[in-house]
């Protein structure tokens, strides 16, 4: 794999097909559960804890599937999708550093929602600050994250945990 510091939408789709990090690497979900359009920055030494940083973006438009059903007459992006996007990015980071296995969200310490994403918004930015990475037989990442819409931070999450598993049949 060619380890890059940014990834296009086509790269993210390749991850969803299992083509980006190899056949045993973690995959992102496919649309409509893929919650980002591009990864604009990745590094192993940056972030608030100097253990890695990921920044990704989602372009908002009223035709996104969730706006049609959540809620009729009062469209808003479900907050859980922003949380899932942060878990997706922690798993993506683990694959980027060479971790193998199927990604699973393992938990989160605290989540705060202080705003909303409406169909009139333009852009969502996700920021992930890795706090701890284990890349041995156990592959796990822990991070703090935030979701910003049009310049305002509206969600924060601490201790996002994602693990990579060789076998998920008994998970």
From Swiss-Prot:
Pathway: Lipid metabolism; fatty acid biosynthesis. Keywords: Cytoplasm, Fatty acid biosynthesis, Fatty acid metabolism, Isomerase, Lipid biosynthesis, Lipid metabolism, Lyase. One of its GO terms (molecular function) is (3R)-hydroxyacyl-[acyl-carrier-protein] dehydratase activity. Its EC number is 4.2.1.59, 5.3.3.14. It catalyses: a (3R)-hydroxyacyl-[ACP] = a (2E)-enoyl-[ACP] + H2O; (3R)-hydroxydecanoyl-[ACP] = (2E)-decenoyl-[ACP] + H2O; (2E)-decenoyl-[ACP] = (3Z)-decenoyl-[ACP]. Pfam families: FabA. GO terms for biological process: unsaturated fatty acid biosynthetic process. The active site is at 70. InterPro entries: FabA, FabA_FabZ, HotDog_dom_sf. GO terms for cellular component: cytoplasm. Disulfide bonds: none annotated. Necessary for the introduction of cis unsaturation into fatty acids. Catalyzes the dehydration of (3R)-3-hydroxydecanoyl-ACP to E-(2)-decenoyl-ACP and then its isomerization to Z-(3)-decenoyl-ACP. Can catalyze the dehydratase reaction for beta-hydroxyacyl-ACPs with saturated chain lengths up to 16:0, being most active on intermediate chain length. Homodimer. Belongs to the thioester dehydratase family. FabA subfamily. HAMAP family: FabA. This is 3-hydroxydecanoyl-[acyl-carrier-protein] dehydratase. It comes from Histophilus somni (strain 129Pt) (Haemophilus somnus). The gene is fabA.
């Amino acid at each position: 794999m060619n380890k890059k510091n940014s990834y296009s939408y086509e790269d993210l789709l390749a991850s969803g097909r299992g083509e980006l990090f190899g056949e045993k690497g973690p995959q992102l979900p496919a649309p409509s559960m893929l919650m980002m359009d591009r990864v604009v920055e990745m590094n192993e030494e940056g972030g608030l804890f100097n253990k890695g940083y990921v920044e990704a973006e989602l372009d908002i438009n009223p035709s996104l599937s969730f706006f049609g059903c959540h809620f009729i007459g009062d469209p808003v992006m479900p907050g859980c999708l922003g949380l899932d996007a942060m878990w997706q990015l922690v798993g993506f980071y683990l694959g980027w550093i060479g971790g193998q296995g199927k990604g699973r969200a393992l938990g989160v310490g605290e989540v705060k929602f202080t705003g909303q994403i409406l169909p009139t918004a333009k852009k969502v930015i996700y920021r992930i600050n890795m706090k701890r990475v284990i890349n041995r037989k156990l592959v796990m990442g822990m991070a703090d994250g935030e979701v910003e819409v049009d310049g305002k931070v509206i969600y924060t999450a601490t201790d996002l945990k994602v693990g990579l598993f060789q076998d998920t049949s008994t998970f």
